[in-house]
Amino acid sequence: MALLNKLLCFALVFMIFGEFVTPDCYEDWSRCTPGTSFLTGILWKDCHSRCKELGHRGGRCVDSPSKHCPGVLKNNKQCHCY
């Protein structure tokens, strides 16, 4: 039930803010983005696990200022595999 509530909240946020977000925002988004990090482990794997799944030794979140959506994706981070 808690998962369903989180998914409904996530969908509602996307519907409300979707109008303010350009399609290019997706290029800046990652599993490390602070605004959606609460869904890590529920809807997607964390950075380290995803990189291992892709055949890398691991991964970590690094600062990556948003190029396309600086007003929406503040303090943006992206997953970098090593």
From Swiss-Prot:
It holds the Pfam family Macin. Coiled coil: none annotated. Residues 1-23 form the signal peptide. Its main location: secreted. GO terms for cellular component: extracellular region. It is found in: Secreted. The keyword Acetylation does not apply. Disulfide bonds join C25-C32, C47-C51, C61-C69, C79-C81. Keywords: Antimicrobial, Disulfide bond, Secreted, Signal. GO terms for biological process: defense response. The keyword Disulfide bond applies. Belongs to the macin family. This is Neuromacin. It comes from Hirudo medicinalis (Medicinal leech).
